[in-house]
Design a protein with these regions (language model features):
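Extracytoplasmic/periplasmic ligand-capture domains
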Residues: 1-60, 66, 76-180
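Short, surface-exposed glycine/acidic/tryptophan-bearing loops
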Residues: 65-66, 71
Length: 180
């Protein structure tokens, strides 16, 4: 028996509600309603900069993952060498949050499955801790995939996504970037 390993084409990513002005599971720190901060590119960039990808790879995934800056790993057809993961930069993230009008942050729930991807719930918990460092009071709610995906895709009003900030995974069936 010969054992080998290598990167898969599965990428774990965060889906952020950028379209609804009033997004569920996002409030001011006091719990009052606010305009959806995820609509602001500076907030989304701040979130990306607050993620310590090296820590997720080494501690949560115990070295069996690689950082990704796009939806496929290096070496796959259609992957750009110019798209790198954002650095871990909490100081810059805090500045972007302030520039976007959220110097004190806001509250948000991270939703994800707890039985679909390797260490999915642990990744969500690690992300919450990282977001808390830049002023986003993030809580985590995970659930079995049979419940999660239905609610994530059409569990809200008018069959809209029920969640605002979701942990998801994606892999190209053909191993190239244009594959759905």
């Amino acid at each position: 028996v010969q054992l080998s390993s290598g990167p898969s084409n599965r990428v774990i990513y965060l889906n952020m509600d950028q379209f609804r002005e009033n997004s569920p599971h996002i409030t001011a720190k006091d719990g009052s309603p606010i305009k959806n901060p995820l609509m602001d590119v500076r907030v989304r960039k701040a979130i990306s900069l607050s993620i310590n990808r090296d820590a997720i790879v080494s501690r949560v995934m115990e070295g069996i993952a690689v950082k990704a800056g796009q939806l496929l790993p290096a070496g796959c057809h259609g992957v750009s060498d110019n798209m790198k993961p954002d650095p871990y930069a909490t100081k810059m993230a805090k500045k972007l949050m302030a520039d976007a009008g959220y110097p004190d942050g806001f509250k948000m729930t991270i939703h994800g499955p707890n039985d679909r991807y390797i260490n999915d719930a642990k990744i969500a918990e690690a992300l919450a801790q990282m977001l808390n460092r830049v002023g986003i009071d993030a809580s985590v709610e995970t659930m079995p995939k049979a419940v999660y995906f239905k609610r994530a895709s059409r569990g809200g009003p008018n069959k809209s996504p029920e969640f605002s900030f979701m942990l998801l995974g994606w892999g190209a069936g053909s191993g190239e970037a244009s594959s759905p």
